[in-house]
Amino acid sequence: MVLSEVDIVKADPAAASQPLLLNGDADVAQKSPGSVAENNLCSQYEEKVRPCIDLIDSLRALGVEQDLALPAIAVIGDQSSGKSSVLEALSGVALPRGSGIVTRCPLVLKLKKLVNEDEWRGKVSYQDYEIEILDASEVEKEINKAQNTIAGEGMGISHELITLEISSRDVPDLTLIDLPGITRVAVGNQPPDIGYKIKTLIRKYIQRQETINLVVVPSNVDIATTEALSMAQEVDPEGDRTIGILTKPDLVDKGTEDKVVDVVRNLVFHLKKGYMIVKCRGQQEIQDQLSLSEALQREKIFFEDHPHFRDLLEEGKATIPCLAEKLTSELIAHICKSLPLLENQIKESHQGITEELQKYGVDIPEDENEKMFFLIDKINAFNQDITALIQGEETVGEDDSRLFTRLRREFHKWGIIIENNLQEGHKITSRKMQKFENQYRGRELPGFVNYRTFETIVKQQIKALEEPAVNMLHTVTDMVRLAFTDVSMKNFEELFNLHRTAKSKIEDIRTEQEREGEKLIRLHFQMEQIVYCQDQVYRGALQKVREKELEEEKKKKSWDIGTFQPSSTESSMEEIFQHLMAYHQEASKRISSHIPLVIQFFMLQMYGQQLQKAMLQLLQDKDTYSWLLKERSDTSDKRKFLKERLARLTQARRRLAQFPG
């Protein structure tokens, strides 16, 4: 179960009045009479707080942030805003200082509170390097060394992370990401576009909805003019995930203290998460080597004695310990709120990458025997997909249709063409009969059908279907060829030589099978020039035609009471129409079924079988295995990249599943 914000509050009911212990305050707390009760509450709080932060830290360490945004607190501020001093006060260690750009890489600051240990431990890690630090005074040197390694010796910046992990009884449970200070113009040997680069880096982090933006602003400047708060407002216009930190309250001009108090009380520039005010070591105190623990004591005294700011201390809005408590609570609540969505995003990304990785297959083996088995598997998979196409059993997308379904549509069109041919034939027959009666009728008695005329009309009608049949063959051939090519693309896309070879086979066999299919179709229409039908079949068809016409004649309304006698021409035409209709029905049955059968046999069955045999024959030449299995130059890199992402997300899912919340 994921912790809710209510659970966090319940875990430590004294949180509002008992700030987390930092540095020198620890000794004071040990002498307090309520320390045992506080320790029990602290223990309950630790059981819920630390696992949440550790979970996100472990996901970040895995590199999951390369794939998905993780809950975080990003610290931003203008140069000389006091950002480094705030982080030093929270962490208890000195961080790089100086003029110009000091933070040149994003610094992930992991603070882990040790409850029952007095030992201080530190660790710096970046790229593939990691070093344990046993003395807090070594931190600054190691951070500078890391920045020089990553971003160079100059003043350049880098997007690559440096992680500083500190475990101590004097730090809060908290993880922050420190970003470079905002600069407006390049100075000294800084790159001319340094300001743009820094803002781009900062925006990369603060625009994520999963990030709480911690904006550090000096108390002695107009808050509306600060670049850091302006950038935060751009990505968080409602101020829902921004916290303001005012620094250097000792430098506020007299008479303007009330304005600072109004800012901290959220009356000037509203932020949903509000403001805090802190006083860190000044430059003179740093030069005098004032310890961080003593600086905390002085900070507390400063706010207690200040006539305007003491109320802010009582409200829990002043001092580093109160800030640490607020940040920890905000981070935990933010993590708990984000976990369900994060878990779902990781699941979806894992599924998507798994599907994408399947397209790239497995790594090509180096051993020759293993190459043979690998090639056999690839060709067998291809042949199985071809078989599925031939049998109309291939798997298709929701909006797609199977090849056989599309072929049936073409064959249905063929039936319509035949029917239209019959209708057109009636018109032609009528004209020819009129011409015969008017110009060529010889000694035949009225009403007699000229068989040669009947035969000529039948042959012409059927002959007119030959080219449409051949055109249908070409259409179906293209459909099958494209389907086979898609199968090759699916199975051999990354093996470009094998894909090219398969396409060549597909084209060669297509030409051969199309030629054979066309030959048989034309042969069929040559045979159809022989007017023939079984006697009993033809008599039955003719009888049905006559019965149908007789039935239709009875339904017609008579316009004349007297007996109507049709002319000899009309009788002859009616008779020949009946014969043409009867013969056309039987011939149409033959043609409408036989032509699709021929096309299916040559352009689907034989085409597919010959292609499968041709692909298996590739296995006979072992010298071509390496050539056939040659990948595209970027395929191996892409596969490796996807595998690394999949491994990260797999571990992330495992850790989320093990999370005790």
UniProtKB/Swiss-Prot annotation:
Q: Give all N-acetylmethionine modified positions.
A: 1
Which residue intervals make up region (Bundle signaling element (BSE))?
A: 341-366
Q: Where in the cell is it found?
A: Cytoplasm; Endoplasmic reticulum membrane; Cytoplasm, Perinuclear region
Q: Where is this region: Stalk?
A: 367-631
Region of interest (Critical for lipid-binding), residue spans: 554-557
Please give the residue ranges the record annotates as the region G1 motif.
77-84
List keywords of the entry alphabetically: Acetylation, Antiviral defense, Cytoplasm, Endoplasmic reticulum, GTP-binding, Immunity, Innate immunity, Membrane, Nucleotide-binding, Ubl conjugation
One Gene Ontology term from the biological process aspect of the record: receptor internalization
Output the Gene Ontology cellular-component terms. Answer: cytoplasm; endoplasmic reticulum membrane; microtubule; nucleus; perinuclear region of cytoplasm; plasma membrane; presynapse; synapse
Residue ranges of domain GED in the record: 573-661
Entries under InterPro entries matching the protein: Dynamin, Dynamin_GTPase, Dynamin_GTPase_CS, Dynamin_N, Dynamin_stalk, G_DYNAMIN_dom, GED, GED_dom
Location of region: G4 motif: 247-250
Region G2 motif, residue ranges: 102-104
**Would you tell me the protein name for this molecule?**
Interferon-induced GTP-binding protein Mx1
Query: Which species expresses this protein natively?
Result: Macaca mulatta (Rhesus macaque)
Q: Which gene encodes it?
A: MX1
